[in-house]
From Swiss-Prot:
Belongs to the iron/manganese superoxide dismutase family. One of its GO terms (cellular component) is cytoplasm. Transmembrane segments: none annotated. Destroys superoxide anion radicals which are normally produced within the cells and which are toxic to biological systems. Catalyzes the dismutation of superoxide anion radicals into O2 and H2O2 by successive reduction and oxidation of the transition metal ion at the active site. SUPFAM superfamilies: Fe,Mn superoxide dismutase (SOD), C-terminal domain, Fe,Mn superoxide dismutase (SOD), N-terminal domain. The gene is sodB. Homodimer. PROSITE patterns: SOD_MN. It catalyses: 2 superoxide + 2 H(+) = H2O2 + O2. Binds 1 Mn(2+) or Fe(3+) ion per subunit. InterPro entries: Mn/Fe_SOD (IPR001189), Mn/Fe_SOD_BS (IPR019833), Mn/Fe_SOD_C (IPR019832), Mn/Fe_SOD_N (IPR019831), Mn/Fe_SOD_N_sf (IPR036324), SOD_C_sf (IPR036314). Mn(2+) binds at H26, H80, D163, H167. This is Superoxide dismutase [Mn/Fe]. Fe(3+) binds at H26, H80, D163, H167.
Length: 202
């Protein structure tokens, strides 16, 4: 069964950009609920011991009765597990090395990336995510998904994600999603994103 991954920092650590109350509720309540639900759906099946990312990659071949729960709750678990890791206190700044080079060659540079990523997060109607992903051709792409859909299900590997469900920002930012997106760039853990980029290339 899946379990809630501990955070590498305190709930207060991302203040003032992401508030402690949001972090605690988001982690212990929302993420935990996705885990409880996907565990319940997979209990007693041969899929219960597989990494959730592997199930999302082969979503279309899963038994029909499991597709919905894995897509929604398994997606919620995988997406949030990535989200916590790509955040860090004293984050932000700029990516370095191979990732910086790829952002330049594939997307047009950091400013262009931030613009595209902000647009993806802003124009996602309703709930969903903005992503920086690696395609099967090993190219970087900015994309967005609805609800808890994962880029893994369409063959891409997400390396940076931003949750734009209202539960991720409403307590502090209410309807000011643009402000939340701007604040996110101050807590991005580019070292972790770079690590995930290298992993996706392997």
């Amino acid at each position: 069964a899946y379990t809630l991954p501990p955070l590498d920092y305190a709930y207060t650590a991302l203040e003032p950009h992401i508030d402690a109350q949001t972090m605690e509720i988001h982690h212990t309540k929302h993420h935990q609920t996705y885990i409880n639900n996907v565990n319940a759906a997979l209990e007693g099946t041969s899929f219960a011991n597989e990494p959730v990312e592997a199930l999302l990659q082969k979503l279309d071949s899963l038994p029909e009765n499991l597709r919905g729960p894995v897509r929604n709750n398994g997606g919620g678990h995988a997406n949030h597990s990535l989200f916590w890791k790509v955040l860090t206190p004293n984050g932000g700044g700029e990516p370095k090395g191979a990732l910086a080079d790829a952002i330049k060659s594939d997307i047009g540079g950091l400013d262009t990336f931030k613009e595209a990523f902000t647009k993806a997060a802003l124009t996602r109607f309703g709930s969903g995510w903005a992503w920086l992903s690696v395609t099967p051709e090993k190219k970087l792409v900015v994309e967005s998904t609805g609800n808890q859909d994962s880029p893994l299900s369409t063959g891409n590997t997400p390396i940076l994600g931003l949750d734009v469900w209202e539960h991720a920002y409403y307590l502090k930012y209410q309807n000011r999603r643009p402000e939340y997106i701007g604040a996110f760039f101050n807590v991005v853990n580019w070292d972790e994103v770079s690590r995930r980029y290298q992993e996706a290339l392997a």
